[in-house]
């Protein structure tokens, strides 16, 4: 039995890095990993623009303005967002009525908010002075020319898509998705469209694990079920592995009579990286490699399977895409109550709010899944340690 960190290290040492790219539509890049660094070709804004509704002025001509002694300027025109041209022959004591986002002509260097005026049409009274640059967005105030707006190996979010759209970019080069297969094992499993009979259960883990992978913006290209028979398992592994970057198997890794997955992997010439990790639930988790495909074999119990996948998958993903943002999201918080020692390193269903974490259920069976709906994280308890109320503990947040 090895520690979780050592097991993850053994997996990442054999995890290849994605170098292949593809071009996708801008909206389709959401959640994907950038395949190139992009620099701004256009400053934003690319013209001086008004920061609010009001009057474009020369700031010096508002100096000393008060309600009792306002500055009075001639309104020589108006500009709204989208207007591109304005000609003004008058050079002194004038103002332009203007809306937020509108182009500010040369020689005007500030905008007086309309609330500081009498809303005049031909002439406007200004009751407060402004300084040069006030409510005036200069060229490049948001994005400078040649500013980096997207780095290679960065996960693309909605804000980045907004910046790319500001540049008129409608297609993005991204790294190709990780190709993942999921194989659930067990003769007791039946497909969802079949009626249940005594001794049988629906193949729910298959869908839970597939949903987990899809939520991470990766591709499930094989979804299958296999019996516990070692010959059939070996045949199925040989068939599907070459198409995949990672194969996730579920069940068949413990020490029961029908737990034949380790045997099947050995028969096909696979390399076992580890089997059994100091963690609960999901102790019998196994990592292996067959040809170029990495295999993560998780527990057949639903909660244990989710814990195994959560604690291994994000590390593999971060390695595959060379993107640290994809790693496990963890935080040190305060334990709200005492936890008795556990022989193995333990991961509990928990809920963190405002820096404090509670167990939300008294049931911690690895076969139960419904009580995870009230949780937002896993609480870690080191092996053999009594955790007292107020202790600092690590939590790992659900990310799908």
What kind of feature is each model-predicted range?
Residues 2, 22-31, 36, 143, ...:
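Flexible glycine/proline-rich
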Residues 29-43, 84-97, 287-288, 294:
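Short, hydrophobic/aliphatic alpha-helical segments
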Residues 18, 22-26, 48-73, 107-121, ...:
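Short beta-strand/loop turn elements enriched in aromatics
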Residues 15-19, 37, 104, 147-153, ...:
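Structural signal for hydrophobic packing residues in well-ordered secondary-structure cores
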Residues 1-4, 172-298, 302-308, 312:
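Helix-rich terminal scaffold detector
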Residues 2-4, 56-222, 378, 397-399:
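Short, glycine/charged-enriched hinge/interface segments at domain edges or termini
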Residues 1-67, 74, 325-345:
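Short, low-complexity N-terminal leaders and the immediately following helix N-cap/first helix
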């Amino acid at each position: 039995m090895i520690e979780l960190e050592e097991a993850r290290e053994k997996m990442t040492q054999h995890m290849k890095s994605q170098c292949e790219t593809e071009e996708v539509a801008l909206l389709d890049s959401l959640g994907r990993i950038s395949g190139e660094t992009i620099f701004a070709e256009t400053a934003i804004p690319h013209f001086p623009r008004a920061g609010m509704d009001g009057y474009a002025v020369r700031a010096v001509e508002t100096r000393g303005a008060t309600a009792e002694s306002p500055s009075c300027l001639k309104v020589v025109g108006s500009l709204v967002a989208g207007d591109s041209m304005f000609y003004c022959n008058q050079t002194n004591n004038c103002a332009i009525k203007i809306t937020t986002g509108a182009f500010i002509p040369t020689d005007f260097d500030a905008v007086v908010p309309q609330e500081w005026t009498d809303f005049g049409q031909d002439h406007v009274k200004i009751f407060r002075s402004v300084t040069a640059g006030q409510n005036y967005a200069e060229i490049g105030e948001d994005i400078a020319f040649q500013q980096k707006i997207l780095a290679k190996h960065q996960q693309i979010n909605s804000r980045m898509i907004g910046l790319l759209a500001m540049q008129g970019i409608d297609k993005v080069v991204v790294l190709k998705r990780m190709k993942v297969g999921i194989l659930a094992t067990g003769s007791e499993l039946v497909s969802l469209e079949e009626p249940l009979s005594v001794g049988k259960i629906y193949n729910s883990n298959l869908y839970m694990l597939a949903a987990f992978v899809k939520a991470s913006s990766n591709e499930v290209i094989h979804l299958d079920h296999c019996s516990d028979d070692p010959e059939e398992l070996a045949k199925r592994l040989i068939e599907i592995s070459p198409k995949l970057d990672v194969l996730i198997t579920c069940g068949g890794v413990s020490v029961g009579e029908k737990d034949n997955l380790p045997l099947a992997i050995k028969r096909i010439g696979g390399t076992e990286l580890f089997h059994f990790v100091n963690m609960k639930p999901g102790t019998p988790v196994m990592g292996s490699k067959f040809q170029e495909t990495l295999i993560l074999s998780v527990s057949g119990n639903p909660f244990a399977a989710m814990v195994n996948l959560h604690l291994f998958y994000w590390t593999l993903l971060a390695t595959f895409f060379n993107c640290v943002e994809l790693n496990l999201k963890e935080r040190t918080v305060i334990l709200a109550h005492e936890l008795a020692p556990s022989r193995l390193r333990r991961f509990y269903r928990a809920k963190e709010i405002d820096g404090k974490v509670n167990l939300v259920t008294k049931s911690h069976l690895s076969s139960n899944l419904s009580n995870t709906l009230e949780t937002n994280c896993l609480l870690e308890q080191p092996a053999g340690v009594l955790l007292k109320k107020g202790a600092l503990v690590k939590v790992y947040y659900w990310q799908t």
